[in-house]
Amino acid sequence: MITISDAAQAHFVKLLADQPEGTHIRVFVISPGTAQAECGVSYCPPDAVESDDIELAFNGFSAMVDEKSAPFLEEASIDFVTDQLGSQLTLKAPNAKMRKVAGDAPLVERIEYVIQSEINPQLASHGGNIMLVEITGEGVAVLQFGGGCNGCSQVDITLKDGIEKQLLDMFPGELTGVRDVTDHQHGEHSYA
């Protein structure tokens, strides 16, 4: 469920040494499954352990995860990184905003998951996003661009060389193409 690097484990052991005996860490997600999802790590004293918590054992401590956060922490990783500016814990939880879907889930759910977890975070750097409108009977994903992508002069390249290529590679035999139905209006909101 959660991978904690050796460096991060050593850091937690050091921090927990100054806490009351039996204290572990808690990894959690606030507002899981939403665009506002935020992940965190806190101390978890023995009296804060809930009966439905999931306990993950590590070297010298345990990480407690509440039942509601667990599916959103699949494939999460915690690392302790040191560089010229100092040291910091990093927590990456790719499924915090949207629960990972099973490989046998309906095509529309799997495509929506890829859009929300992989494509939209890339487009967000330009203030843009896409939305899946429908999948046609011919297997074409009909998309609508929003934000900075609406009216952007690079939208055709983004669609064909980026999004379509990625989706066709991920869903061969199920998806035959992508189509943009956005009424593009170039304006100050447009990225380029």
From Swiss-Prot:
Keyword 4Fe-4S: yes
GO molecular function: 4 iron, 4 sulfur cluster binding; iron ion binding
Cofactor stoichiometry and binding remark: Binds 1 [4Fe-4S] cluster per subunit. The cluster is presumably bound at the interface of two monomers.
SUPFAM superfamilies: Fe-S cluster assembly (FSCA) domain-like, HesB-like domain
Reported cofactor(s): [4Fe-4S] cluster
Presence of keyword Nucleotide-binding: no
GO biological process, one term: iron-sulfur cluster assembly
Keywords attached to this entry: 4Fe-4S, Iron, Iron-sulfur, Metal-binding
UniProt-annotated binding residues for [4Fe-4S] cluster: C149, C152
InterPro entries assigned: Fe/S_biogenesis_protein_NfuA, FeS_biogenesis, FSCA_dom_sf, HesB-like_dom_sf, NIF_FeS_clus_asmbl_NifU_C
Assembly: Homodimer.
HAMAP family: Fe_S_biogen_NfuA
Recorded family membership: Belongs to the NfuA family.
Function as written in the Swiss-Prot or TrEMBL entry: Involved in iron-sulfur cluster biogenesis. Binds a 4Fe-4S cluster, can transfer this cluster to apoproteins, and thereby intervenes in the maturation of Fe/S proteins. Could also act as a scaffold/chaperone for damaged Fe/S proteins.
Name of this chain's protein: Fe/S biogenesis protein NfuA
Organism taxonomic ancestry: Bacteria, Pseudomonadati, Pseudomonadota, Gammaproteobacteria, Alteromonadales
